[in-house]
Curated annotation (Swiss-Prot):
Quaternary structure note: Associated with the spliceosome.
Species this protein is from: Debaryomyces hansenii (strain ATCC 36239 / CBS 767 / BCRC 21394 / JCM 1990 / NBRC 0083 / IGC 2968)
Name recorded for this polypeptide: Pre-mRNA-splicing factor SLU7
Location (main, coarse): nucleus
Annotated family: Belongs to the SLU7 family.
Length: 370
């Protein structure tokens, strides 16, 4: 490409060629330069002059009527001038009127009156007997106050049940210590339940309810194992390329024997059979360990160590606790010998034990008091 093609000449509006080597600060006339009409007509560089609209304006000089565009908002019967200055744009209550809230309050009052009418109608339909109402009038009470929990009903039952034992008494008499939860501020027995995430005391299941819950869990576990087995078989058939059995892969067959609600008797028998199998396997494992390592003679308790307190009897009843409810010793108590009125060890003096009745320190000696 030649140099002439690179630098093509430029022409102004009058058709004269523009010299590209003249700098801009020389060719361009500043905006503050006073121009005359003759200069404008003879100016061959007028196309490079700054536009009048782009020239800087002197705002210190008042210019009435320019740039004024007032906007008004008509609300109701008044005209409000719309002024969006810095503060009004950031005012959260700008344009708020109290009349809007009055309309909302009126709507709420209408809804409240409708509810009150329906409530009064239901109260009139389910009113109490005349004798009960007359008695309330004599006592200076109103049935509406009682229903709204403003006053206590004097005719309400106030006698406590005999079997209603306070929780603090149960905690004192029980072997477990009082358990206080500082988060929920509840004093509960942890053996009877627990406090959940919603700050509610949930009782543990006992008796028939616990057995039913265990049976339901057993049914769920059996159903889960069967589903896993079906999925494994379907995956193996897919790998081997075998076709599904009759009914197709989309047909789902439910085993009613694994449903607690459909067949509870069968589920109970299965659970019992499963428990017997586990117990048999446990006993077999235990016997194998004993046969391998020995020590079977220590598994069965000897008669010499079977509850020594039960062998110590007075008459036909075993002596386990005294009259105060305290646990007795394994040795005989209140068994006076050699005409003593106290037992050996009831007296101590000079580092020696003795009898409290005669102050003797020789054991199995006859009492000298009588």
């Amino acid at each position: 490409m030649s140099s002439q093609e690179k630098h093509k000449p430029e022409y102004d509006s009058s058709g004269k060629e523009v010299n590209p080597y003249i700098p801009k600060f020389i060719s361009a006339v500043p905006w503050y330069h006073n121009k005359s009409n003759d200069e404008k007509s003879d100016d061959y560089l007028s196309h490079q002059r700054s536009n009048v609209a782009d020239e800087a304006k002197d705002h210190s000089i008042p210019q009435p009527g320019s740039g004024i565009n007032d906007e008004f908002e008509i609300k109701g019967e008044t005209e409000i001038k719309k002024v969006e200055d810095y503060d009004s744009k950031r005012d959260r209550w700008h344009g708020y009127e109290a009349q809007e809230w009055d309309k909302i309050a009126e709507n709420w009052d209408k809804i409240k009156k409708k509810k009150q009418k329906t409530k009064n109608a239901s109260v009139e339909e389910d009113s109490d007997d005349t004798d009960y109402e007359l008695e309330l009038v004599e006592l200076g009470l109103d049935s509406k106050d009682i229903k709204n929990n403003l006053k206590e009903d004097p005719l309400e039952k106030t006698i406590r049940d005999r079997q209603d034992v306070p929780a603090y008494i149960l905690n004192i008499t029980s072997s477990n210590k009082i358990h206080y939860d500082p988060k929920s501020r509840l004093t509960k027995d942890p053996s009877k339940g627990f406090i959940n995430d919603k700050n509610q005391f949930v009782k543990k299941l006992t008796g028939e309810a616990k057995r039913l819950d265990n049976l339901q869990k057993f049914a769920w576990e059996q159903n889960r194992q069967q589903e896993e087995m079906k999925q494994r078989e379907a995956f193996e058939q897919k790998l081997t390329g075998k076709k599904h059995s009759e009914g197709g892969p989309d047909e789902y067959q439910v085993d009613l024997n694994l449903n607690m609600e459909a067949n509870p008797t069968a589920m109970m028998l299965q659970a019992r059979h499963k428990q017997e199998q586990q117990q048999a396997s446990h006993d077999q494992k235990k016997s194998d360990l004993v046969a391998k390592y020995g020590g079977g003679e220590f598994l069965n308790k000897s008669k010499e160590f079977v509850n020594v307190t039960e062998s110590i009897q007075t008459g036909d009843k075993p002596i386990n606790k005294d009259k105060n409810g305290l646990k007795r010793s394994i040795y005989p108590e209140d068994n006076y010998s050699m005409n003593h009125q106290s037992i050996w060890g009831s007296y101590y003096s000079g580092g020696q034990w003795g009898y409290c009745c005669c102050k003797q320190t020789t054991r199995n000696s006859r009492c000298t008091l009588n």
